[in-house]
Regions:
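Short glycine-rich phosphate-binding loop at a beta-alpha junction
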Residues: 1-8
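Conserved acidic residues
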Residues: 2, 64, 94
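Residue-level signature of catalytic and energy-coupling elements of molecular machines
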Residues: 4, 26, 96
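Generic enzyme active-site microenvironment
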Residues: 6, 68-69
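Short Gly/Thr/Asp-enriched flexible loops that form oxyanion-binding sites at enzyme active sites
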Residues: 13-22
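Short, glycine/charge-rich flexible loops or terminal/linker lids adjacent to PRPP-binding catalytic cores
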Residues: 23-67
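Conserved G/P- and acidic residue-centered "switch" motifs that form tight phosphate/ATP-binding loops
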Residues: 71, 76
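PRPP-dependent phosphoribosyltransferase catalytic core
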Residues: 81-125
Length: 125
C-alpha cells in the first residue's frame, strides 16, 4: 500500500491513522474550493442532492497502490466518486475499507457492480 485516501471530513479521522499504521502516505479528498492549485473533480448524486469531490492532480504518483478509507458506506456515491478520482490520478485502487455499512441502502452491491473492491467493513447494520 502506497497511499491511503480519506474523504472530507469524517473519513480523515480514520484514513490518517490507517495510513500511519501501514507506513503509507495520506491524501485528502475534499469539497470544491478547499485545495489550492490544480485539482481533478468528480460530481456524484446523494440521496438528498448532489456533491463534488476534488483531489490535487499531483497527489499520487501514477501506478501507486491506493486504499480508500471512509467512515460510512451508505449509497456508495462518495466511494464511487473517490474511486473515479483515483483512476484519474493514474493510480491502482486496491481496496475500500469502511467502519460502518448501512446494508439497506445497497452501497456494497453498487460497488460490486462498478468493479470497485474488495470492500472491508468493520460493522454492518
Amino acid at each position: 500500500m502506497d497511499v491511503v485516501v480519506g474523504m472530507e471530513a469524517r473519513g480523515f479521522m480514520f484514513a490518517g491513522p490507517v495510513a500511519l499504521s501501514l507506513g503509507a502516505g495520506f491524501v485528502p479528498v475534499r469539497k470544491p474550493g478547499k485545495l489550492p492549485g490544480e485539482v481533478y473533480s468528480q460530481s456524484f448524486v446523494l440521496e438528498y442532492g448532489s456533491e463534488t469531490l476534488t483531489v490535487h492532480q499531483d497527489a499520487v504518483p501514477p501506478g501507486s497502490k491506493v486504499l480508500i478509507v471512509d467512515d460510512v458506506l451508505a449509497t456508495a456515491g462518495t466511494v464511487r466518486a473517490t474511486a473515479s478520482l483515483v483512476e484519474q490520478l493514474g493510480a491502482e485502487l486496491v481496496g475500500v475499507s469502511v467502519l460502518l455499512e448501512l446494508s439497506a441502502l445497497g452501497g456494497r452491491e453498487k460497488l460490486d457492480r462498478a468493479g470497485i473492491g474488495p470492500v472491508d467493513v468493520v460493522l454492518t447494520v
